[in-house]
């Protein structure tokens, strides 16, 4: 029978519930337990697909085309398991489903209420994940903070869950903050006590406390938390701040998180195999060099807007024993001050996805600079479209060339709306979303990076390269190195003769893993290391000449 772990958070938001859930998933998987992780988000949006990146951060796309919370990216990267639309649930999607059932007469004329109709729908979504893949353990993260009014239906649903499936089949895990007060020079447990009190008032007694803190939690403090929160002292887990999220599984493993969880669920306490993960962390902590890569975007004020891109660069760096230092460049600043001011000392330039015209000219200038200065370049989604615009304007000399998204009146729409998007009215969930096949052309950079001829990548876009300009693109030196299997959609372009210049319509960042970096990111970081080494050698030669 599938077991269930529910992860709640208290005291403050952004406490790290997603990383705790993902870390527990990693630890259970290292013991050969199968795991699926579910996120319950309390906002009323049906999904985050139409939300501003500044408010929500990255929209993570699953293989089956769901637009989900960025925590699903953590789940996939830590457990190396692909999630689906079943693993992301919002208040909006719950209410939408219940209202649709009411309209169909499914409730036989009854009064539709939060209890039992909303809570039953929430429980059904959790059971659906268990039925779909039949994992040993389903870990469910409840978004928000205990005490928020928005989370109450979810908390009531998980309270009922233990009664429904049996006491020994459910663990309640509460992630909380133990702050250090500089003036008093001590850590304080009172916020956690009040958070647990709030949780108890709903009817949930936590079985495990995961305590976020910036220094070790002393045994006396654990005993105090145990006494006041009615949690066994061995189930009070220290989750001390780490330099990298990939250290967290090892930290909580030493604290006995997985061991306590398995004991509470009456599961066999198997020995973990964390050798690969320990090696990964060790390589991260002892890089041979540091390279600087510029990320030229329009949402750079919030790094979470590009979370999977950032993590994919980290993965590539680990593989080549390098620390990737990110230079966050606002594309609008390039429009104002020029590309050289921000990009002259970097070893690689990455232009990620995005929507809307703001900052596009700055991205185009950054790509031109990468092309002319022979700096390794990787473009993703909008990054590829901007690379096409840069080609059209500066190489093909096509008058007022642009994307139809940014200038519907352009005489040269080198990027155009996908035909199937022409009659689409709604914004949410209507793009080209999810996993699609791409056929690679032989003897290209793309084919040298990937081990197979046909690849499968995740997409999120409405616009595509306009095939009316494909012949001209090729005639002027570019290569179309990846297309849809029918040859219609251009998926990858590259520039021969350049150290590394490649751009994709898809989002490779969604499939990178810490122990298995995505081929494009690995190739890009390797090229950046080569560029760094070349520049370093040239600088040393210049110094010798001066001497």
UniProtKB/Swiss-Prot annotation:
Residues annotated to bind CTP: 13, 148-150, 188-193, 224
GO cellular component: cytosol
Catalytic activity: UTP + L-glutamine + ATP + H2O = CTP + L-glutamate + ADP + phosphate + 2 H(+); L-glutamine + H2O = L-glutamate + NH4(+); UTP + NH4(+) + ATP = CTP + ADP + phosphate + 2 H(+)
Top-level taxon of the source organism: Bacteria
Positions of ATP binding: 14-19, 71
The protein's enzyme class: ligase
Keywords annotated in UniProt: ATP-binding, Glutamine amidotransferase, Ligase, Magnesium, Metal-binding, Nucleotide-binding, Pyrimidine biosynthesis
Active site: 381 (nucleophile), 507, 509
Sequence positions that bind Mg(2+): 71, 141
First and last residue of the signal peptide: none
PANTHER family: CTP SYNTHASE, CTP SYNTHASE-RELATED
Role summary: Catalyzes the ATP-dependent amination of UTP to CTP with either L-glutamine or ammonia as the source of nitrogen. Regulates intracellular CTP levels through interactions with the four ribonucleotide triphosphates.
This protein's name: CTP synthase
Origin species: Rippkaea orientalis (strain PCC 8801 / RF-1)
Gene designation: pyrG
């Amino acid at each position: 029978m599938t077991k269930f772990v529910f992860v709640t958070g208290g005291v403050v938001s952004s406490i790290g519930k997603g990383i705790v859930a993902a870390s527990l998933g990693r630890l259970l998987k290292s013991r050969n337990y199968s795991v699926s992780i579910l996120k319950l988000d309390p906002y009323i949006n049906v999904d985050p697909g139409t939300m501003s990146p500044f408010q929500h951060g990255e929209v993570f796309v699953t293989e089956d085309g769901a637009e989900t919370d960025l925590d699903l990216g953590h789940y996939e990267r830590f457990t190396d398991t692909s999630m689906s639309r079943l693993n992301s649930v919002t208040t909006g999607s719950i209410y939408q489903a219940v209202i649709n059932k009411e309209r169909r007469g499914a409730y036989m004329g009854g009064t539709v209420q939060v209890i039992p109709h909303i809570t039953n729908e929430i429980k059904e979504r959790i059971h659906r994940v268990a039925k779909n893949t039949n994992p040993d353990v389903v870990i469910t993260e409840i978004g928000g903070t205990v005490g928020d009014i928005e989370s109450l239906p979810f908390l009531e649903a998980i309270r009922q869950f233990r009664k429904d499936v049996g006491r020994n089949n459910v663990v309640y895990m509460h992630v909380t903050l133990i702050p250090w007060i500089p003036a008093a020079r001590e850590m304080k447990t009172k916020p956690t006590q009040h958070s647990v009190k709030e949780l108890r008032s709903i009817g949930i007694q936590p079985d495990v406390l995961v305590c976020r803190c910036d220094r070790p939690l002393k045994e006396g403090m654990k005993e105090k938390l145990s006494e006041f929160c009615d949690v066994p002292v061995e189930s009070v887990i220290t989750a001390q701040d780490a330099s990298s999220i990939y250290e967290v599984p090892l930290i909580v493993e030493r604290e006995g998180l997985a061991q306590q969880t398995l004991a509470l669920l009456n599961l066999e306490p198997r020995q973990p195999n964390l050798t690969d993960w320990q090696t990964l962390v060790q390589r991260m902590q002892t890089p041979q060099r540091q390279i600087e890569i510029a990320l030229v975007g329009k949402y750079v004020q919030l790094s979470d807007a590009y979370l999977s891109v950032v993590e994919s660069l980290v993965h590539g760096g680990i593989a080549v024993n390098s620390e990737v230092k990110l230079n966050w460049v606002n594309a609008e600043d390039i429009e104002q001050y020029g590309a050289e001011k921000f990009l002259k000392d970097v070893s690689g330039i990455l232009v990620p996805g995005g929507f809307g015209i703001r900052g596009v000219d700055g991205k185009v200038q950054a790509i031109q600079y990468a092309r002319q200065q022979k700096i390794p370049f990787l473009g993703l989604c909008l990054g590829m479209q901007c690379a096409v615009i840069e080609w059209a304007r500066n190489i093909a000399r096509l008058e007022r060339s642009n994307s139809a998204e940014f200038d519907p009146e352009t005489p040269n729409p080198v990027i155009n709306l996908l035909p199937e998007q022409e009659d689409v009215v709604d914004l949410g969930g209507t793009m080209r979303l999810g996993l699609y096949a791409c056929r690679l052309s032989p003897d290209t950079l793309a084919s040298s990076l990937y081990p197979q001829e046909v690849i499968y990548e995740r997409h999120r876009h409405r616009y595509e390269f306009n095939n009316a300009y494909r012949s001209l693109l090729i005639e002027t030196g570019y290569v179309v190195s990846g297309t849809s299997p029918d040859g219609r959609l251009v998926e990858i372009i590259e520039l021969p003769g350049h150290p590394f210049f490649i751009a994709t319509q898809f989002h490779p960042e969604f499939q990178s893993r810490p122990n298995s970096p995505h081929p494009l990111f690995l190739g890009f970081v390797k090229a950046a290391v080569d560029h760094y080494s070349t520049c370093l050698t040239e600088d040393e030669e210049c110094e010798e000449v001066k001497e």
